[in-house]
């Protein structure tokens, strides 16, 4: 009887130790289920009837310094790591799980694969507009000409005309919401990115003059079509940092491509070399 009791106690102790060893895996699975449920709630709200309820604050934010947490990609990464906590068969390895748990304590850190996949967001420029991008570059960097500011038709006016054009094609509330979100987002991106990413070096003294002359005006009220087109060469890299899932991002890209088609269709009136002028000798000295 004594030997049976000891054997029973030994088996109970081994079972308890084994359960303790596997607890990190079970708890991690519980967390993964909770994250999966949260992700499901988010995707459930993403309906194609409008731009997407998952795009608050104009496409869900733009800061590269604040990567989204709790994304689908990161949940998968955690699930892949979880089985490692239960590998091995010796109870002497019990202290190891806490070390592994601390290694992944920051849920906001993206995997290298997830980061690279986000860098692949590309906005396709219509073939009709590519020659103008080249001419714009040549006029400014080689011929040393400047786009005349304020523009005859500024970015705000172009976006407003596009919105009116789309709304006139069908008075659907969801469609109107989508157009307003797209136009508002393009305008915000333009105003944020112009001074740091959309200007050639030769244009910077002109930009400084504009800031002095119009300190309270958004740049979308000053600049025109050429600089707006430059935005779409750069915007893909910025979209890589938005917390949008693949479905929402694909929907957004569809709207951006539709706007680019509008620019291409109206390129004859929006893009012309006569809107540039040769910079003065005094300006050349400033630009050196």
UniProtKB/Swiss-Prot annotation:
The modification Phosphoserine is found at residue 71. InterPro entries: MRG, MRG_C_sf, MRG_dom. GO terms for biological process: chromatin organization; DNA repair; positive regulation of DNA-templated transcription; positive regulation of double-strand break repair via homologous recombination; regulation of apoptotic process; regulation of cell cycle; regulation of double-strand break repair. The keyword Disulfide bond does not apply. Residues 1-115 are annotated as: Disordered. Pfam families: MRG (PF05712). It is found in: Nucleus. Residues 117-288 form the MRG domain. Keywords: Chromatin regulator, DNA damage, DNA repair, Growth regulation, Nucleus, Phosphoprotein, Transcription, Transcription regulation. Component of the NuA4 histone acetyltransferase complex which contains the catalytic subunit KAT5/TIP60 and the subunits EP400, TRRAP/PAF400, BRD8/SMAP, EPC1, DMAP1/DNMAP1, RUVBL1/TIP49, RUVBL2, ING3, actin, ACTL6A/BAF53A, MORF4L1/MRG15, MORF4L2/MRGX, MRGBP, YEATS4/GAS41 and VPS72/YL1. The NuA4 complex interacts with MYC and the adenovirus E1A protein. MORF4L1 may also participate in the formation of NuA4 related complexes which lack the KAT5/TIP60 catalytic subunit, but which include the SWI/SNF related protein SRCAP. Component of the NuA4 histone acetyltransferase complex which is involved in transcriptional activation of select genes principally by acetylation of nucleosomal histone H4 and H2A. This modification may both alter nucleosome - DNA interactions and promote interaction of the modified histones with other proteins which positively regulate transcription. This complex may be required for the activation of transcriptional programs associated with oncogene and proto-oncogene mediated growth induction, tumor suppressor mediated growth arrest and replicative senescence, apoptosis, and DNA repair. PANTHER family: MORTALITY FACTOR 4-LIKE PROTEIN (PTHR10880), MORTALITY FACTOR 4-LIKE PROTEIN 2 (PTHR10880:SF25). This is Mortality factor 4-like protein 2. It comes from Mus musculus (Mouse). The lineage of its organism: Eukaryota, Metazoa, Chordata, Craniata, Vertebrata.
């Amino acid at each position: 009887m004594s030997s049976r009791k000891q054997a029973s106690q030994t088996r109970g102790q081994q079972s308890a130790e084994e359960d303790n060893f596997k607890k990190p895996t079970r708890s991690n699975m519980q967390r993964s289920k909770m994250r999966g449920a949260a992700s499901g709630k988010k995707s459930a709200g993403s309906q194609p009837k409008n731009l997407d309820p998952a795009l608050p604050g104009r496409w869900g934010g733009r800061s590269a310094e604040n990567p989204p947490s709790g994304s689908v990609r990161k949940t998968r990464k955690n699930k892949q790591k979880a089985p490692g906590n239960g590998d091995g068969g010796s109870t002497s390895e019990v202290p190891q799980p806490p070390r592994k748990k601390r290694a992944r304590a920051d849920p906001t850190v993206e995997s290298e694969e997830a980061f690279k996949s986000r860098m692949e967001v590309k906005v396709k420029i219509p073939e009709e507009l590519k020659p103008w991008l080249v001419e714009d570059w040549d006029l400014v960097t080689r011929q040393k000409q400047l786009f005349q500011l304020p523009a005859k038709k500024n970015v705000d006016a172009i976006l407003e005309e596009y919105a009116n054009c789309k709304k006139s094609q069908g008075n659907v509330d969801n469609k109107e919401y989508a157009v307003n979100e797209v136009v508002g987002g393009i305008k915000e991106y333009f105003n944020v990115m112009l001074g740091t990413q959309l200007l050639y070096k030769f244009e910077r003294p002109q930009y400084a003059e504009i800031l002095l002359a119009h300190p309270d005006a958004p740049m979308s009220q000053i600049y025109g079509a050429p600089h707006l087109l430059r935005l779409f060469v750069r915007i893909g890299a910025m979209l890589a940092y938005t917390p949008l899932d693949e479905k929402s991002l694909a929907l957004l890209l569809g709207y951006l491509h539709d706007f680019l088609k509008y620019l291409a269709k109206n390129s004859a009136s929006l893009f012309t070399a006569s809107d540039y002028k040769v910079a003065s000798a005094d300006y050349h000295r400033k630009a050196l």
